[in-house]
Amino acid sequence: MNAILKVCLFAAGLAMGQVVLAQASPVSSQLVAQRVEMVAGKPVLKAAGDGKPGDVLQYSATYRNTGAAAAAKLLATVPVPPGTTFIAASAEPAQAQASTDGATFAPMPLTRMVKLADGSTRKEPVPLSDYRALRWEIGTLAAGATTAVSLRVSIDAPVVVSAAKP
C-alpha cells in the first residue's frame, strides 16, 4: 500500500476513534475505505490497495447500536483526509454538513467571506479541497439498529516544492 493511501487511512481511523469515544455510548463504528472503479459505466467498489493521484476512494462508516436502549442525538462524522479532495454530491445520505477544521460544521456548499483589494468583502465558495470532515445528524438509533454514511474523495497529486534559483 503506498504512502498516500496509508496516511489517508491512518488519519481517517484516528478521527473515527475520537468520534466514538466522545459519544460514550454503546454505539460502535467501523470505517472502510474502498477504491471506486468504473466498470461498464457504473461505479464498482474494490479493495483500496495501492492508491495514486486521481484515484477515487469511498469512505463508508457503519454505526451499530449494541445497547439495550435507543441512542439519541447520534452524530456520524467521517474525516476527509489530508491529501484528498471531497467529491461534490458524493455524500450519502445527501444532507451532510461539512467542515474545514473538523469542529465547526455548516450545510454544503460551504462559503466564506473574502476581503477584496478595495476593502469590500464578498462571499465565495470554499474549495472542496479545503473540506476536512463531513457530519450527519442521525438522531435516534434504535437498540440493535445499524446505519451507514459514506463520502468519496479523490487522491490529490503530491505537492512538488522546488527551491528558487538566485
Question: Would you name each region that the model predicts?
Answer:
Residues 2-3, 21-166:
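Exported/extracytosolic protein signature
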Residues 5-12:
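Sec-dependent signal peptide hydrophobic core
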Residues 12, 17-19:
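N-terminal signal peptide c-region/cleavage motif recognized by signal peptidases
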